[in-house]
């Protein structure tokens, strides 16, 4: 069990390393609206990754609030530590959702359709990337957004292939696609 915990923390350390280096690169290589848009994009993505992680760790792993907090990336979140703490201490998934929806970032949950809670993070990422791809004036923001959209479309192709392979109903397959 300690091996599982340390493996999970290794994942957290890797994600912290990636996000801290990403933040350094953005701050050193960009300025103005480009910096603001890139930081906002990655911060919102991390906020929803933290949200999904809280839901998953509560539901499937029954971890304590302290263990859940150790698996989150606080420094790269626009959600306050106090709010993340409330999410970790929530008794049910519904309570986690309501705490998230109280935040500025959490308002996107109402705008996207999702079947499973794990769908929320990729759907938000796709929605933001599509918006940035069309409306940003900064080439780096458009490029990273395009990469996120391409990644999502590849996931959709895989979902279609697997759904067909396992003979799922077309309505079920359609509900799993991120559009």
Where are the language model's segments positioned?
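Solenoid-like repeat scaffolds
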Residues: 40-44, 75-77
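Single conserved hydrophobic/aromatic residue that forms the stacking wall/gate
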Residues: 2-13
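Long, low-complexity, acidic Ser/Pro- and Gly-enriched intrinsically disordered regions
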Residues: 21, 25, 53-56, 70-71
């Amino acid at each position: 069990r300690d091996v599982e915990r340390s493996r999970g923390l290794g994942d957290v350390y890797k994600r912290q390393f990636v996000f801290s280096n990403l933040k350094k690169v953005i701050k050193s290589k960009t300025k103005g609206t480009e910096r603001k848009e890139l930081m906002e994009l990655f911060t919102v993505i991390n906020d929803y990754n933290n949200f999904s992680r809280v839901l998953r760790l509560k539901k499937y792993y029954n971890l304590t609030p302290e263990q859940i907090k150790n698996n989150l990336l606080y420094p790269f979140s626009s959600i306050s530590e106090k709010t993340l703490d409330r999410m970790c201490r929530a008794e049910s998934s519904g309570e986690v959702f309501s705490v998230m929806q109280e935040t500025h970032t959490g308002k996107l949950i109402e705008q996207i359709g999702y079947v499973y809670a794990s769908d929320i993070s990729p759907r938000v990422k796709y929605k933001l990337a599509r918006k940035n791809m069309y409306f940003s004036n900064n080439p780096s923001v458009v490029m990273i957004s395009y990469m996120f959209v391409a990644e999502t479309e590849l996931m959709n192709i895989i979902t279609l292939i697997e759904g067909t392979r396992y003979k799922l109903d077309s309505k079920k397959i359609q509900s799993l696609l991120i559009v």
